[in-house]
Design a protein with these regions (language model features):
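Walker A (P-loop) ATP-phosphate-binding motif of ABC ATPase nucleotide-binding domains
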Residues: 2
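Hydrophobic anchor at the beta1->P-loop junction of P-loop NTPases
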Residues: 5
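The conserved Walker
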Residues: 8-9
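Conserved lysine of the Walker
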Residues: 13
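Conserved substrate/cofactor phosphate-moiety recognition/catalytic segment
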Residues: 17-58
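Short, structured coil segments at secondary-structure junctions
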Residues: 24, 85-87, 112
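Glycine-rich phosphate-binding loop used to anchor ATP phosphates in small-molecule kinases
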Residues: 46-97
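Small-molecule kinase domains that catalyze NTP-dependent phosphoryl transfer to phosphate-bearing small molecules
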Residues: 83, 92-155
Length: 155
């Protein structure tokens, strides 16, 4: 499974992603860490598109290895989010503007997301609990769409 946590810089993406990954025994992939490691693209739309492709490729490798990838980065446009093709998305909508003018101008509010964090309580555990409850409910809902999966458990 590929989970995308996105939003403006400073919105709490990494603060949520790190403990979320630990709780579900997933692999956390942070956009800043990946960008810093390679440092080969700028922050233009093209550079951000290339970063999104790289993040998606790394996450796909984690999923292929049988783990859950929890990816956090800005992912500024609806098209990028669509191309990233996450199984579950969390939109961190906790700030109106970041300190980066170009990112503010480029960032598009999402057409859709699985979970929308509109305020940060200052309590990571409380916020994480809300996201996790929704995530589990969503997975159970998807599981109910495939009743044949129960038969696999019994074999």
């Amino acid at each position: 499974m590929k989970i995308l946590i996105f939003g403006l810089p400073g919105s709490g993406k990494t603060t949520l992603a790190r403990p979320f990954a630990k709780l579900i025994n997933g692999i956390h992939i942070n956009g800043d860490d990946v960008r810093q490691r390679y440092c080969d693209w700028d922050f233009t739309l093209t550079g951000r598109y290339n970063q999104m492709r790289r993040m998606s490729h790394v996450a796909d490798g984690v999923v292929f290895a049988g783990k859950t990838a929890i990816v956090d980065f800005v992912c500024p446009t609806n098209k990028f989010r669509e191309l990233f093709n996450a199984d579950y998305t969390v939109y961190m909508d906790t700030i109106d503007k970041s300190r980066y003018k170009d990112t503010n101008e480029m960032f598009e509010k999402p057409h859709s997301c699985d979970y929308h964090v509109s305020e940060w309580f200052g309590d990571t555990h409380k916020q994480l609990s809300k996201v996790l409850k929704h995530f589990i409910a969503k997975r159970e809902e998807k599981h109910n769409d495939y009743p044949w999966m129960d038969a696999l458990k019994d074999s």
